Amino acid sequence: MPDPTAPAPAALSDAEATVRATVARDGVHVVHFWAPWCDNSTAELAGGWYEVVARHPDASFTFVTVWNDGETGESTLARYAIPERVQRLVVPGVQPPKGERRTTFLGLPLTWIPATWVFNRNGQLATAFNYGEATPAQLDDAIAGAASAWPH
């Protein structure tokens, strides 16, 4: 029975509600947090995200733009040929000072971008790259691991 004295959970943002519904579906789901002003985010896009998406047609991909004044950064995604099949979401809010970039998403800490979370076919977080760029090989391995029969 829930504790009646516990504080009520914070309401989910539209982006969180959409991601929660996405990862609850059967399959492997990749959720990528980024911002177009972030050099590490754009370096990671240039490093091969288009190819990773192309190699994994059975996985879903969601790019969540954070700390960017509510803008998606669509022109940056287009510059790096991120395909339309990648879902684009935005968490509203301005870019906070570097020391204050701490938030949660689905109750999990999000303190750095880029960050990439890979959910397995059971909707459970299987791999999290939380502090910077992930290589295409690391992403491929994480997606393969999330798709495997091993119960993460």
Positions of PLM-derived features:
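Solvent-exposed loop/turn segments at secondary-structure junctions
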Residues: 35-39, 67-71, 94-96, 124-125, ...
